[in-house]
Amino acid sequence: MSESVTTGSDDDGGDRESSPVMLSQSFDPMSSSSNSSSEENSDDDYEKTISSKKRHPRPNSKGVNVKRSRRNAIVEEDPQEEIFNNLFAFLLDQKVDTMDIAVSWFADYAKDNQSALANLINFILKCCGCNRAINVFDVQDQDSASATLSQIQLSVERTSTRDYPLNSKNLKFRNFRKRLTGLLSNFVSQLSIRNYLYNSTVFEDIMSWVVAMSSSTMRPIRHTATVFCLNIMTFLCEKSKELLNEHAIATKQLEKEEKRSRVNRNRINELNNSLGEIVKQQDTLTTYLNDYFDSVFVHRYRDVEPKIRVDCLQELGVWINTVPSIFFSGSYLRYLGWMLSDINTTVRLTVVKVLRKFFETDSFIGGLRHFSSRFKERILEMSCVDADIGVRVASIRLCNAMRTCGFLENSEILKVLKLILDINPRVQREAVLFLCKVVDESVNEKIDLWGEEDYILKAFSQTSLTTFSVHWIKFSQMCKLLEEVRLSYQSSFDYDTLLRIFQKNGNFITPITQALLNACEIDSIYQSWEDISNFVLFDNYTSTLKDPIDSILSFCKLNDFQESILLQLLSASIQTVCNNNFITPKTVHNKQAAETTNDQNKDKDLLYLNLLPYINSITERNSASPTLLHDSLRLLFSMDLTEMTDPQLSRHFELLINNLKKFFLTNNDLQIIQGCTILFLRLDSIPALKEDLKLLVTDICDQTVTEFLKNFGSFNIQDAVITKDEFVIFEACLTRIEGCTSLKDFSDYPEFDIIYERLVSLLSRVPNSYEDTLKFSAINTLQSLLFWFFLRKDNPADEEKKKDDETKVFNCLINIMNNDSSKILQLQAARTFLETVIMKEGVKASHYNDDNRVSEEHNFLKPQFLDALLKILEGWLYTYAKVGQFPFKRLTQASSPHTQISLDKNPLNRRLLEHVCCDLTSKLLIVVSLSNTITPEFSQQFCELRGHYGPKLSAIVDEFLN
C-alpha cells in the first residue's frame, strides 16, 4: 500500500485549518534524528496553535499585592540544582492521593491566587521535563504567555534531554501518566464543584498557558501540553454528559409537575431555574470544548510526532463516545477518516480501533452511513494490502463490524473473504473468523425462513431421512462461500502443475484445507466429522412434496466443486479431532499417567474403528470422479496410521488396500495413482499389515512392469512421435512405474536395465511442453531407482556401472536445467538433482563410518551444476517477487532471462511460490554444505537475500550460514 497520507476533501465544510495536510510532504516521523538532544526535541515544521477564542473580563486579583515593576528575567544558563515543585513531588509520590493534591492546590488558590497559578504553571513545566520556572509577574499578564514560553524555550533548548516524564523509562515515572490523568480528573471535578469552571477566569488563565505550550517547537513541551489539554477536554466531556443527564431528569420532573392536577408553582419555578442554570453551564462547557478543539486538536492531530497524533485520535474517540450530541457528526468523524492514510503504523492502528467501537455501538449506526460510504474503500484496502500485519488484522475486524451494520456490499464482503487464502497466518485466521460469522448469519436467516430448528428436526424425523442433521445447512453454506472465494482466483496450468509436484509427499496442505482447519478451531461444529461424513454419503435428494424439507434438501445439494470442499472440510475435521482431542503426555512418571495414556489410545482406536468404515464408503462412492476420489484418499493423510493397533481394524484395512490396488491399476489420473502410492507407504508402518501388503505390492509391481514393457519395449522413445492416445496411455503407465519404484526395490528385477535405459532415452527427447508430464514421471522414477542403487553394497566391480548410470541421469538433468523451455520441468530437474545428492551422501555416511571415505568424492557439485542451480533459483525468486509485489533482489550477475510462468498476483500463487523458493533454497544450501564449497562470496550472495523474501526464507539462510 501507499504509506503517504492523502488530503481528505471536506464534504462537511470548514476552514483551511480543519483540513489535514499531506504528511508525506510536511514531515517524516521516521526520519533519523540528530545527535544533538536539542534537535531531537525540536520540530521546525510544527504547526503553531492559535489562541483560545473565549476570553472573559478579568476580575480584580485576590491575595498579595505585587509591584509589577519588571518582567521575570529568564536566565540563559541552566540552574545548578533541580527546581523544586511541591505539586510535581506529590504526583511522583505514589502514597499521595491525587484528589488530595487537587484539594491542596485549591486551598492555596483561595489564599493567594497568583502564587497558586504560578505554582501550577511551573508544575506543568516540570511535567514537560523543563527545569525552568515563572513567577507571579508572568501570571499577571496572560497575554504575554506565548512570549514568556518562547524565552523559556530558547533558554532550555541547549540543555534539554530527550527524556521527559511522559516518555521516560525511569522507574520513578512508571505510573506518571496514570496519576497525571487522575489528577486532571480531580482538578476538573473540583473546578466544577467550586463553580470556578463557570463563574471564574481561573480555568481560562490556566488553559491560556497550556494552549500556548501546545504550539511549542520543543517536542517535550508540545507533547505534554497537548496531553494536558486533551485530558482536560475529556473530563469536560464527562462533566457535560453529567449535565445532559441532569437536564433530562429535570425536564422529566418539570413535565410531571406541570401535569399534576394541583400545580406547585414554587416547585415549577425551582425546576425552571435549575434547567436554566444547567443550560448555561452546558453552553459554557460546549464553548470551551469548541475553542480548545479548534486551538489544539485541529493542529496537533497532524503533528510531526506520531505519539501526539495517536493521543489526539484516541481522545477524539473518547469524546465522541462520551458526548455524541457534540462530537458525533461528520465534521469530527472526518478527522479519523483522513488519518486512515497516515504513514505511521500506530496511528493507523489507533484510528481503526477507535472506529470499530463506533460501529459496534447500536446508537451510532445510523450516523455512520455517510462516513462508511466515504471511507470504506480505504478500510478494505488496509485489510488487503497494508504494510503492517496488525493493522490488517484490526481492519478485518472493523470490516466485520461494518458488515454487521449492513454497510458492506456482497462484492466488498468477498474481498475480505478472499483473505482466508492470505499467506500470513494471522490475517488468514482473522479472515476465517470473518467467514464463520458470515456463514452463521446467513444460516440463521435461512433457518428463520424455514422455521425454528426444532420445527425442522421434527419435520425430518417424520421421514426416512434419519441421518439428516441441521448442521448440514451450515456445511452447505460454508462450501458455497468457499467455492465463490476459490473461483474468484483463476487457476492456471502452471499453478496446477506446481501444486501437483508439491502435493506428491501427501504433507502439503491445500489453502482451502488450511482455512478450514482454522474454522474447526474457531467453531466446534466443524469438528463434527460424523455429521459431515453422513452428509457426504447422502444421496436421497428426491422430492418429498413437503416443505420445508424440499427447500432444505435443494439448498444442501452440492455440485462437484462444492463436494470437493466438503471433503476438505471432513479432512480438516478429522485432523483437528485427531490432533487436539487425543494428546499423549510426553513423559509418564506414575501409574496414573500411564493409565491416562492407555485410555487415550483406546479412545483413538475407537475413533479409527468408527471412522474407517466411513472413509471406505466415501472412497467407493466417489471412485467414478477423479477429483472427488483424490480428495477422499486425502482423508487418510489426516490420520496417523501408525497408531492403529486394534485388531478389529484389520477387516477395514483389508477392504481399504484392495480398493487402493484397484484404483492404482485401473485409474489413469495422476493424482489418484500418487495418492495410492503415498497410502501404501504409510500403511506399511502398521506391523499387522506388512506381510499382506508386501504380497499386494509385489503383485502390483509385476503387473506394472508388464504394462511398461508392453508400451515401451519396442517403442523408439527417443525419436518417435507420440500421438494423443499414446500420450494418455504412457502418462498413466509412467506414473504407475513411478509409484512402484517408490514402493519396492527394483534393482533385482531382470527388467531393471531396460526400464532405466528407456527412461534416460525419454529425458533425452527434444523439449516439448506437451510431453512435460512424461518427463516428470521419468525424473522421479530414475531418482527412486538411483536410491535403491545407493542402498546396495555391491562388489567393487559393480561400482563402475553405478557411477556410469548415475552420470547418465545427472547429464540428463543438467541438460534439462540448461536447455529445456519448461521452467517447471527445470525446477523439478534441479530439485531431483539436489535430493539425489543429499540422498547419496546420506547413504554413504551410513555405510561408511570413515569420514575420509565420504569426503573423497565431494566433486559432485561441479561449477556448471552450481551455476545452473543458482540461475534457476534466481528465476523463481524473481517470479515470487513479481507475484508478491515486492522488490527483486538479484542472486547472480548473470544476464539470462528470468523465469516467466503464467501466475496471477494473488495469495494462492504467492503462498505456493514461497514454498517453491524455500524448498529449493534449503536443498541447495544443504548440498553446498555437504560439498564443502561455501565461499565468502557464496555466503554474501545468500546473506543479501535476508529480509527481501519473507521470514521463512530468511530463517533458512540464517540456519545454514550463521
Swiss-Prot record:
Main location: nucleus
Subcellular location, record wording: Nucleus; Chromosome, Centromere
Coiled-coil region(s): 236-275
Pfam families in UniProt: HEAT_SCC3-SA (PF24571), SCD (PF21581), STAG (PF08514)
Lineage of origin: Eukaryota, Fungi, Dikarya, Ascomycota, Taphrinomycotina
InterPro entries xrefs: ARM-like, ARM-type_fold, Cohesin_Scc3/SA, HEAT_SCC3-SA, SCD, STAG
Function, as annotated: Component of cohesin complex, a complex required for the cohesion of sister chromatids after DNA replication. The cohesin complex apparently forms a large proteinaceous ring within which sister chromatids can be trapped. At anaphase, the rad21 subunit of the cohesin complex is cleaved and dissociates from chromatin, allowing sister chromatids to segregate. The cohesin complex may also play a role in spindle pole assembly during mitosis.
Organism whose genome encodes this protein: Schizosaccharomyces pombe (strain 972 / ATCC 24843) (Fission yeast)
Xref: PANTHER family: LD34181P-RELATED, STROMAL ANTIGEN
Polar residues biased stretches: 21-30
Domain SCD: 297-382
Record bears the keyword Protease: no
Region (Disordered) location: 1-72
Name used for this protein in its record: Cohesin subunit psc3
SUPFAM superfamilies membership: ARM repeat (SSF48371)
Bias kind Basic residues: ranges: 51-71
One GO cellular component, as annotated: mitotic cohesin complex
